[in-house]
A protein has these predicted regions:
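Hydrophobic hinge/microswitch elements
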Residues: 38-39, 114-159
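Secondary-structure junction motif
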Residues: 91-114, 180-181, 188
């Protein structure tokens, strides 16, 4: 029996290895097929019916079953501590992410600053972005979990204008009839126990 799942890269890297190991011990006869990538691409694949379970970040217009799995604070990462009031004057290393997340970052930025970021580098590779930060070339804006494998960088949690941490939510989406497929029901129930 097979259960196709799609997930975002960050969740695939930091959570899915442990989840899949535990799931396979509990359900050794259920085979999992997983694909990872950007939230907007994976969500589109899910809507097209290619996958039974979708783990994505951010706000999506999903009206069937969903479960909040995780909240990750958004941070400004830099080699040295930052004065957040002066952020527009620091060199910015822009990680070209999915459009939904970029909108969140843009909304946060322009709620706090009148000037655009002083962008010096743009990259679509998160590891490249973090290496540039690690070398002291500038700062970047990412979820806190993205920097956990990069030593010697400092995260500063972004806050709303009300002073609350800015969080990025990770959701598991599945359809109302998920219980009709044994493998999908097993995985959804397993995730409900863990999260």
């Amino acid at each position: 029996v097979c259960s196709p799942i799609i997930t975002i890269n960050v969740f695939a890297k930091y959570h899915m290895p442990r989840i899949l190991t535990q799931f396979r011990k509990t359900y050794p006869r259920i085979e999992i097929h997983m694909k990872s990538g950007f939230s907007h691409d994976r969500y589109r694949d899910f809507l097209e019916g290619k996958y039974h379970i979708c783990i994505v970040r951010g706000e999506h217009n999903w009206n069937e079953e969903k479960r909040l799995l995780w909240q990750d604070p958004l941070c400004a990462f830099s080699k040295d501590s930052l004065n957040m009031d002066l952020l527009p004057s620091y060199p910015y290393i822009h990680y070209m992410t999915d459009p939904l997340f970029q909108n969140v970052l843009d909304d946060w930025w322009y709620a706090h600053y009148k000037k655009p970021p002083f962008t010096i580098i743009e990259t679509d590779a998160m590891d490249t972005c973090l290496k540039m930060v690690q070398e002291g070339l500038g700062f970047t804006l990412l979820s806190r979990s993205c920097g956990q494998d990069t030593p010697h960088i400092h995260p500063t949690v972004l806050t709303t204008v009300e002073g609350k941490p800015l969080l990025r939510e990770t959701w598991m989406f599945y359809r109302h009839n998920y219980h009709l497929l044994t493998s999908v029901k097993a995985f959804v129930d397993f995730m409900k126990e863990k999260y």
